Regions:
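Accessory, non-ATPase domains that flank or precede helicase/AAA+ motor cores in DNA-metabolism machines
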Residues: 1-468, 480-496, 781, 806, ...
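A general secondary-structure junction signal
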Residues: 48-50, 99, 291-293, 541-543, ...
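Proline-centered flexible-loop/turn and helix-kink motifs
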Residues: 271-272, 621, 708, 782
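Inter-lobe coupling/hinge segments of SF2-like helicase ATPases
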Residues: 304-310, 314, 326-409, 413-768, ...
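Short secondary-structure junctions
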Residues: 620-623, 778-786, 831-835
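Helix N-cap motif at beta-to-alpha junctions
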Residues: 763-764, 808-814
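A carboxyl-terminal module marker
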Residues: 776, 780-801, 822, 840-844
Length: 847
């Protein structure tokens, strides 16, 4: 038995060695309670077990194991190690991101730790008592209940039907979870290829809580069911439901009732029967109730129907299968509306059929609600949704359930789902792989979920499918070089055709007097035509709020944040007016007078979504207008309400930021207006053109997704802009070739790796001295590969001043060695007395 364990703690520290007490059995990847320092108690992960005694006198012992299950398998530990190494952070920082908060309690004593320790919820499971697990006794019982207690009759019928495996369910009664309506029609595609999954009923061997109990009943159960005691009270005529249930019972009891199935149990949450009726059956000794540890989201018996593929989709699916035989990763480059999701569904079904796990990554769960709902309609209770907006208890229960799973799991999640314990992970699908939401900015590790998905799939011996209509240039070049396979789906699904894209010259409209508010006449006329035909419109302005700032027309004063070096955004929601900082959240009232010169008519400058909403409602007073941005979506319920209202055609015009570009499929939208393309193209970022193309193409793709032709109008003061013309021509490859040529010339990704170093401190002089010292230390090792120090456009946030240093490493050099040298320089910088108080952040592959 190993005597020592290297334990990873949720700290920005290396692993520490603890002693394993005699008689305690531990496994690598298991969670344990340890004391760290004089009075801190933490959850730790056993990383290595060994017999090498450390070179210090007193070694603290592991206090006790936690959770009773291994949290991390070998592949997952290797994945954590890769993340920590590549993104230059500690395993403890990976642990902080990977595990739900309730799995990382801490305290100043064991008692305080125990008070915050996660305790699984229990739930009630029902089973037939042994006396009624035969056909003869069930026939007799149904006959008695049918005469005197129709509600108990229906409850027992539901329990028996739920216990039976589907092939034995001759009555056609849905099995567990009522089949979750998983055989419902599939969205916008014809359903075929019904795939039945192996039936299985919850058994008495399911994990139970330590305090699991059986509810006792008094007396002999067989005696409690005389005709005198079975009634439910005053007699009543049988309801339609009970008559239907009687027919179901006849069919059910006409089929064989295997005793092994009747010996199973069913959780309360899967029964529609009211609790008082179940209690009556329990009290009279027909059923038994026991408390078990809740296993949320566990896959029940399901059968799912797969959408019929078009010939083009079928060819793509075949190509992907063939490429998976020789490559880990494949890029599915499909135009908007081409039906990439249908291909995902077929690959997911094939993987689940083999008993393997699937992970579908989406940029943001809330913004891809339609995709999640589609998957739930197809795969039913197999779908587990995981993201940061779930309660910590729900996230923890899901994590622990997956630790016990033997495979066949399907998780749909945002980037954090990458760290779930899917032991048989064989397929990762990254939808909208280009999306910047896959990159974590804070805290460390500052990882890109797309890149991590490729590594995870390789470590688990699986495959990754990267899907996008506008792939990132890194992914596109990897496919062009043969690192990834590439499959192109170049036509829209069904009758839908690509939208017509029109460039509208804003400067010309102003000169001709053909502009009202922030709309060219060309766009206003198109909106009027769509409204007259009963069609819907989406208007895109990638700036929330009413105006970017307010200004004094007399002296030029603008309101600025006291904590950050930015102007305050003017918001005007309903009757309230306020100035808000979008960096730190500072809010203040709009001044009545200019603080500098006392002029009273302060003027909003520029426009955001709130102003667009107000102006379009004034120009089209009969139109029903809604807004979708971070300010209007105060909760998931508000988001779903806005989206559902637009889908029902309760809204004619939807105004929004980039939130309207992600994953939506509204059949009534025939016009999309992009109100200000210039602020996308002219951003001071080497990726500006690529991102402008991606965003405008994704927004444009919302138009004309059914038989109704779509049109997109792009308002710009620079109609000759290459990227805007490339969007209008839907020419991704022209954009890619041009941008890659420029990046090759100036030595930017994907022809170089970047590491961005950000220094923060409240003393600007100390900060800039430290930034200069760090840049010089890096130049002594990396030479001209170092840029900076630089002052970012926003150089003060939350009271801290910022400075930056950028390291470029050519793609042909060893990035592993570069990180090793960089770590040496950073450690030496942090150890120095003068600059140790400077907060230094390291971002590998910054976005």
């Amino acid at each position: 038995m190993s005597r020592f364990a290297d334990i990873v703690l949720p700290l920005a520290q290396p692993a520490y060695t603890f002693a394993v007490p005699e008689g305690m059995t531990l496994a690598e990847g298991q969670a344990v309670l340890v004391q760290f320092g004089a009075n801190r108690y933490y959850t730790g992960i056993v990383w290595r077990l060994h017999d090498r005694r450390p070179d210090f006198r007193r070694i603290k012992p592991v206090l006790r194991p936690l959770y009773g299950v291994q949290l991390l398998g070998e592949e997952q530990r290797r994945f954590w190690e890769w993340v920590a190494s590549y993104y230059m952070c500690s395993l403890g920082e990976v642990m902080r991101v990977a595990l739900p908060a309730l799995m990382k309690p801490s305290g100043s004593s064991e008692e305080e730790f125990a008070a915050g320790e996660f305790r699984p919820r229990s739930e009630t499971w029902f089973s037939l008592r042994e006396e009624f697990r035969s056909e003869e006794r069930l026939h007799e019982l149904f006959e008695k209940l049918g005469r005197r207690a129709p509600r108990q009759y229906e409850a027992l019928l539901e329990i028996v039907a739920a216990l039976l495996p589907d092939p034995q369910n001759a009555a056609g009664i849905p099995a567990s979870d009522n089949a979750l309506a998983t055989t419902a029609a599939c969205s916008d595609a014809t359903c075929s290829d019904v795939v039945p999954e192996a039936a299985g009923t919850p058994s008495d061997t399911a994990p139970m809580a330590a305090d699991a109990v059986s509810t006792p009943t008094s007396g002999d159960p067989s005696e409690s069911f005389s005709d005198d005691t079975i009634g439910e009270g005053a007699s009543a005529p049988a309801s339609d439901a009970s008559i239907a249930a009687s027919c179901d019972a006849e069919a059910l009891l006409a089929a064989p009732l295997p005793p092994e199935a009747l010996a199973g149990a069913i959780p309360r949450r899967l029964l529609a029967t009211e609790r008082p009726v179940l209690h009556q059956l329990e009290r009279k000794g027909v059923i038994r109730a026991e408390e078990r540890e809740r296993q949320p989201g566990a896959a029940q018996d399901v059968r799912f129907r797969l959408p019929t593929l078009s010939p083009a989709q079928g060819r793509c699916l075949t190509q992907i299968r063939e490429l998976f035989a020789s490559r880990t990763g494949v890029l599915l480059h499909g135009v908007t509306g081409s039906g990439k999701t249908e291909i995902y569904i077929h690959l997911i079904a094939e993987t689940l059929r083999r008993g393997d796990d699937v992970l579908l990554l989406v940029p943001e769960i809330a913004l891809t609600a339609q995709l999640v709902e589609r998957m739930e309609r197809i795969f039913g209770s197999r779908v587990t949704v995981y993201h940061s907006r779930l309660t910590e208890r729900a996230r923890t229960e899901t994590y622990l359930r997956l630790c016990r799973s033997e495979g066949g799991e399907f998780v749909v999640g945002a980037r954090s789902a990458l760290f779930l314990p899917l032991r048989r992970l064989r397929l990762v699908v990254v939808d909208e792989e280009h999306d910047t939401s896959y990159k974590q900015s804070d805290p460390a590790p500052r990882y890109n979920a797309r890149d991590c998905a490729v590594v995870a799939a390789s470590l688990f011996g699986g495959h990754v499918l990267l899907g996008s209509a506008t792939p990132s240039l890194e992914t596109w070049l990897n496919a062009a070089r043969g690192k990834y396979g590439k499959v192109v789906l170049g036509e829209r699904y069904g009758e839908a055709r690509p939208p017509r894209i029109v460039i509208s010259d804003t400067l010309r409209a102003v000169k001709r007097g053909e502009r009202k508010a922030h709309f060219n006449k060309q766009l206003l006329d198109a909106i009027g035509e769509r409204l007259d035909r009963g069609e819907q419109v989406m208007l895109f302005q990638n700036r929330r709020g009413f105006s970017p700032y307010v200004e004094c027309p007399e002296c030029g004063w603008t309101a600025r944040c006291p904590n950050c070096n930015v102007t305050l955004i003017y918001h005007r929601g309903g009757s309230s007016e306020r100035l808000v900082c979008h960096y730190c959240g500072h809010t203040e009232a709009v001044p009545v007078k200019c603080p500098a010169c006392r002029v009273t008519d302060l003027a909003p400058r520029g426009f955001g979504t709130e102003k667009v909403e107000e102006e379009i409602a004034r120009l089209f007073p009969r139109a029903r207008v809604a807004r979708l941005d971070r300010d209007s979506v105060t909760s998931e319920r508000a988001f779903r309400s806005i989206v559902a209202g637009f889908a029902r055609h309760d809204t004619d015009i939807l105004v929004g930021t980039q939130m309207i570009s992600k994953g939506f499929d509204f059949e009534g939208v025939s016009l999309v207006g992009i109100l200000n393309a210039d602020n996308l193209v002219n951003s001071p970022d080497f990726r500006a053109a690529e991102r402008a193309f991606q965003l405008m193409t994704q927004v444009a793709g919302r138009a004309g997704r059914r038989a109704v032709p779509g049109e997109v109008i792009i308002q710009t003061s620079d109609p000759a802009s290459p990227v805007i013309r490339q969007v209008a021509a839907s020419d991704y490859e022209a954009m890619a070739r041009q941008q890659l040529a420029e990046r090759h010339t100036f030595f930017y990704p994907p022809y170089a790796r970047l590491v961005a170093l950000t220094l923060r401190h409240r003393d600007p002089e100390l900060l800039h001295r430290g930034a200069r010292a760090l840049a010089e230390a890096l130049r002594s090792r990396f030479g001209r590969r170092v840029l900076g120090p630089m002052t970012p456009p926003v150089d003060r946030i939350r009271g801290e001043y910022l400075a930056g240093v950028l390291l470029k490493v050519e793609s042909g050099a060893s990035f592993t060695r570069a990180r090793e040298v960089l770590r040496e320089v950073l450690d030496a910088f942090a150890a120095g007395e003068e600059f140790r108080r400077i907060n230094l952040q390291c971002d590998v592959d910054p976005q």
